[in-house]
Structure formats: structure tokens, C-alpha cells
Amino acid sequence: MNILRCRIENYRGFENADVLPRGHVLLVGEPRSGRSDLLAALGKVFEVDLTRLDERDFFRGDTSRDICIEVTLGDLGVELEQRFLDELEFWDPDARSLIPGSDELGDIPPDAVAVLRLAFRGRWDDVDERGDQTIYWTKRSDPASDNLRRVRREDRQAFAFHRLPGGRPLNLAPRGLLRSALSESEAEALTVALEEMRNGIDRLSGELALALPVIGALAATIDVLRPYLETDAPTPDVVRFLPDEGSLSGLLRALSPALDLGDGVGFLPLSRHGSTTHAQISMAEAIATSRHDHAVVVVDDFADSLDTASAQRLASLLRRACGQVWLSTRRPEVARGFEQPELIRLTRGNAPGQRHVHYGSIPTTRAQRVAARELHRQILPAMTARAVLVVEGPHDAAAHGALAERREEIDGTLPPEAHGIRIIDGGGQGGIDQAARLAEMSRSLGFRVVTLVDYDRDEAEAASRLAALQAAADVVVRLPRGMAIEAAILDDLPDADVISALGDVGATYLLPLSAGWETLTGNDLRREAMRALKSNNGLHAQFIQTLPGMLPTMACSALDTAVGCCRGVSATAFVQL
């Protein structure tokens, strides 16, 4: 089973959204873009026991408009198709849309797939001040006339949908994930075993009440109360010790898994093993239980407590085990277990409450494949950023990063990260052409993209590259003609500061400086400095970090301008410094 489409109206932060996954889903996005809301919306359609609906679940608290969440399910299997034969419709996998009039079998294309549509309607009752919730079949329902064909509770149980709860793993309670994966015969056997455990505890509690260290104190206590209790029964018949209420549900609440991991300390409660082990067990449980029914598994904030290797490995296993997995994450290494088209990124629009959906895609050209190499190295680590500042190469990125740190130390100017901006570069080869490719990919994933580049001396070539950049990015910021990053970070610096910083850098790194370089001044000194900064794979950041006084004027101006454009402070599409 897998979800082919999810349409949301007026639910939490979504006024209107249409999500069309391509197989499994890796859900990423900037803060407050709706990752958790989207997964919660899926859960509402498949809830067996409906959870509470309140005013805050309605878009902007407007309870006059109904919540509508519609899900289209494919890859149903024979059992679901036969059980819900009257509700079947057909889906065009190429157009990724429902085929209208699909009851006419002669009009159905040969590659069409059978689907079911289920929907959730949330309506606010002003009289009782509560939310009224209905899950219904879309095919033969008419919400406008309030004619809804409800999906019965037992029918909702037929759908293999698991939303991984935030509670403890290996939970034997009826709503626990482990318990839900049991077959009918296994569930009956577990019930018998739990009853035997409870009876055994009852027997042991009776023996405890008869134990010599206890009986005396209990008898003395009960003797004080006998006139009020009006009983002459022996003390063990009056007092027993039972775990948490004495009921089976209370017993299950008191039970928690304990693990012996072979480290010599024996069995320890899972909570004592730390957050990483807890998260590993939770994910392993989800993988094991989803294998039985090719389920749709939904996990929010996946891998927040996992180490890097476990995050990547468990994400890959979960993807292989499930019919379809929806993972929401902030961890970039999780993406290594997914295909690029399975990436969905949510962003916030400019208007309050506006949200957008963006999709990863398969690179089809050589230029796109080259840019895709930076997906895992730079773009996915920036997945939670609102904007990216694309520079030509690693030297540019290092220089601007160091400059931002120094400015915050000196005058409190906030760095790009404080505004939700990440600096990324064109990779090892770098260059304006690669920056344009990277900008195009970033923009397709919903980032606001600003590029900060050099101005080539060849005017015709500069014009051609500028046009490519403007087509790929939201804003292009260009340094003065003929100025590269090395010249920008030396701009307006006193000769004494340049000599001091080069001397400090040279104390750690072997710089190719000419004999007597300390006596150089003006342009001669700057040419020597630029040659030295390009050595040792670039020492731009180290130079900026050791500057004793003022910072370079042009580099600061360029960074300020680019950050302002990332924030949308400047509406212009091109800035020539």
C-alpha cells in the first residue's frame, strides 16, 4: 500500500496543499513550514480511534470553514481491492491524476491502477464547542450536501498505516506498535500469557502479605482500623500488594523493556541506556513490524537522537521494509538512503501562513549531474535554511564565513546563519558556471537563492555568465570589475595590518613570500598577499581571522548586500557593487 496523493484544506498551517509523492517520501523543510502538520494530516485519515479536534487545528483558527484531508491510496493488493470493490477508482500513473468516469471499464487505459480515496472532514460545532470528525469514502460522497459514506472503524483497521508514536518502544499495551503487528492468534496467545502473569503476581502478592517482616506491621495497622472496617478477617485477606491499580492495563503500564547489551551490567531499563539506544530500538521495532503488511509508515523528526551511521542505516532499512515510508527529518545523512525524486521540501511563502511544496528530481543533463554532486555535501545540510548564498568556490565560502564571525565579534553584526541563511559554494572546481548550476538546483527545492560572484574582465563573457546567473537565481550580486575574492578581502586595509596578518599566518603555514616582502607597500604588497593567500589550498579565512584592526571594506559591503538580498530587504534582481 502507498499514498499517491494527499490534499489538505484548512488544516493547521495549511490553507490549501496538494502533495504528490514519487514513491517513498523524505520530508524536509525550513522551520514552521509544516512537516509535522503534513504527517499529522495523514494520521487523521487513518485514525482508528479518533483523537481530539480543537479550534487550533483549523487554519488560522477559522472554525467556519471545514477541514478536508483527502488521501488517494494505490498498490492495494488483492485483499483490499476485493474488500472495498464498490469504492475502487482508477489512477493514471503518467498524468498522476484520477481518471474521471472510471466506472466505465472500456475507458480505462491499460496502465491504470486501482485506487481508493478516503477523506477526513473536521467541522466545528459551535453549540457543543467541540470538533465533529468524519472519515468517509470520497467516491460516492457529497460533502456539499452532507451526504457522506462513512468508513467504519473495522474498515479503517484494515489499512496498514503506522504512525510511529513518540512513546516508549516495545510497548505491549493494546495501542503499542509491537502489539498492533501481532496476528489474531498471536494476540490471543499474548492475552493468555498476560493473564497468567497477572495471576502469578496476585499469588506472589499474597505470599508477600504473609511474609514475617511484613505481617507484623500490617497486622498492627489493620488492628487500629478494625472497628471502622468491621471485619475480623485475617490481615492477609484484607491487604494485598498489586502493581498500579491491579488491573491488566495497569500492569502493562508498569512493564517496561530492559536490555542486556553485553557490557557486564546485566538487564537495564531501556530508559537507562540513553537516547541513542532508545531511538535505535524504536526504529528497529518499526522496521520489524512493517515487514508483515507492507505498511505505510510515518515517522516525524526521524533520527534526532541517532548517531550519523545509525541514522543512515536505519533509514535505508525502513525504506526497504515498508510499502511506503514518510520520514520527516533535520538530519542530512538520512537522505543517503533515498532517491533524489523522493525528496519533498516544504517552505513558507511570503504571505503569513502560506506554505509551498517542492520536489527533488532526477538530473537529466551533464550540468545537472555535476550540480547534483553537491546535494549531499552542501544543499541537504542547508535543508532547514530559508535562503542560500551561493559563491563561486570554497575559498569564497571560507572567506565570507570568517568575515561574518569577525564582524559579530567586533561590532555585533549578525552572521548569515542568524537570519536562516547558509553559504554554499560551487565545489572544488568552482567558477561562475558551477555557481549557476548550484543556484538552479537550490531554487528548484524552494530556497531563496542569491549568488555573489566575481566580475570577469572579458565583457562579452561576463555578460553571458550574468544572464545564466540571473536565470538561475533570485538575485545576483557582483563584485567590481576585475575584482576577485582575494582583492575584496584586502580592500582598504592599512599596509601595516596586511603585513601583521601575513606574518601571523606565515608562522603556522609555509607562505611563498618573496624576500623582503615586509618592505612592500600599496599595490605591490597586495599582489604579494594575493599570491600567498592562494597557496596551501587557500588561506583566506586564516588571514581574516588574524587581521589586527579594521576589516576589508569591499568584502564587508558585498556580504551585507548579499545577506540583505537573501532576507528580501532589497527587491532588486541584480546588484553591481
Predicted region positions:
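Switch/communication elements of ASCE P-loop NTPase nucleotide-binding domains
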Residues: 1-27, 31-47, 53, 257-381, ...
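Conserved beta-strand position immediately N-terminal to the Walker
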Residues: 24-26, 162, 388
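Flexible phosphate/Mg2+-sensing switch loops adjacent to catalytic phosphate-binding sites
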Residues: 45-69, 351-353, 412-419
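Glycine-rich phosphate-binding loops of NTPases
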Residues: 53-61, 78-198, 267-268, 471-472
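Extended helical coiled-coil dimerization/tether regions that scaffold
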Residues: 183-281, 285-296
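Charge-patterned, long linear interaction tracts outside catalytic cores
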Residues: 226-230, 241-244, 249-256, 400-405, ...
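RecA-like P-loop NTPase motor core
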Residues: 333-336, 341-450, 455
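Activity-critical C-terminal alpha-helical subdomain
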Residues: 454-538
